[in-house]
Amino acid sequence: MTDRYAATAGAYDLMNAPWRAVQVVALEHLLPLLQPDAGPILDVGAGSGVNIEWLLERSPDAQVYALEPSPAMRALALSRIAAHLEWQHRVTVRPEDFFAATLPERLGGAILLGVLGHFDPGERAAVLAELADRLPHGGAALIDLQPPERPEAVPAATISRTQVGELEYRLIAEATPIDDERLHWRMTYLSLEGERVLTEDTAEHIYHHPGPDALLAEAASVWLHAERLGETTYWLLRRA
């Protein structure tokens, strides 16, 4: 199976750096709402394991149940865990996606950052229903919606660049609309010495952009209260 995130994994945390501060603020809002005594914290699309690390460092009672189907991204997460032997009994990193994995019956909370757009409307409804069924009353999940809020053409532009020693790592993104919810994204990852390109990898994704109003309505239909935290982040609270 082709790993669509193999290109991304090469410098994932470097490329994600411009958005990490926003994610951390959202995680800090989520932390007091987690109920680790009710079940593990579900991390869907765990990526490099950066949110696993954040949780395990700040919630000593938490167990994490992570899903990451990309072999390249999963290798990053497992390498992060391997550096902390004390975490190995507190975290499971499964290679399946949301619908292939056996989910815990009860969850103490959930994190879905950068993943909701991978689900079409029917799949998105099923994900929200599964969360509502497994979260305790008052339990919370953290999600985000990737910009733009509605599909529109995005001209090619550098959206992230980081200098590490003598080399620069650069991410160029562009997108074209497919319909009223989907965008076709093209992401180009470069490593450069000056302006000389050393490596160039490209990944293409079809991503769903449901918009805030649609998200709030879909969440409410399964008794999840969606509340906006920042420009792109939301938490979902399980109503009694």
Feature names for model-found ranges:
Residues 1-47:
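Conserved class I S-adenosyl-L-methionine
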